[in-house]
Amino acid sequence: MEKSKKQYFNEINIMRGMAVLCVVIGHSFNPTKTPTILGFIKSFVYCFHMPAFFFISGFLEGEKRRSISEKKQAIVKKAKRLMVPYFFLTVVTAVLKLLFGAFARNPLNYSTLAVDVLIGRNNPNGGLWFLYALFIIFIFGILFDTINRTTLTGTMFVLYMLNTIVFKQSGYVVGFFLSYAWIYFMGGAVRKHIYEKIKNSELLMSVKGIVIIAVVSVGYMMLAFVRIYKSQSWILATAVTVIGVFLLFVIAVQIEHYHCGEKLWMLLGDYGMDIYMIGYYVQQAIFVVCGKILGFDYLVYAWMMLIFGLIAPIFLSKYVVRKNHMLSTLILGR
């Protein structure tokens, strides 16, 4: 049996920081059917930011071989990390929507709440679907850890295509698995086969490489614009997802290499889970108070949601949540 030594990847933490910034941006602004700058930015980050989290998780998991007892321990550990916050924050959000339902963006349907929560559908806190989906994919990866990640990536991608064309499942456990498992396992495959090549690439780590990635990024934004406003092709959508995740990864490696803004991205990466879990409530509070009750202009409270949704969770977590074992367990799964 093989055992993997736990490694810490600064590049992946930086990538997590960039991805969580995209989450906060995506939750701050409204999408638009016709092109606007803020509307495009919101739709743009949605092209790749959640797939990036699955990629990151798969990368960090890598390829591990476990005994039966180790599989059980790993599943219990993942349940504590993901499902404890999932159920706790579901209850918290349901109670808040019960008390302040008149201000809720998405009113709660209590008649189907239990079933919805158990199958990962229509959670009161929309962002919690990620925890549920990741847990299911984690279990699958743990149970089938004897199969290499490249093979699993290919197999899951075939299932993804079949689901997109034939099964068309989405919005609950089966749809989540079929939609994102291939990206998760792709992260493990990239770690094994590509990571060192990118990190040690003289071209990509040179000034010329930075210029190349900048030019490619501009072209990517143009492609994403077409995907958002012009075409509903699943092939284009898939290409935009893969390119976006890979670009984010390469940019993170370049940032780590040149230490450009590294401390900021590392800070956001270190508090990535905290921002994802707590930021929702900060942003919703601003939306209700400033948007619904006080009637602030959309741009005013939207920017407040972005700024405070990013900063407030760091302070709340550092000085309150992480200092309390129970809160840390219930909210962060630590």
State what each model feature region is.
Residues M1-R334:
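Alpha-helical transmembrane segments and their immediate juxtamembrane cytosolic regions
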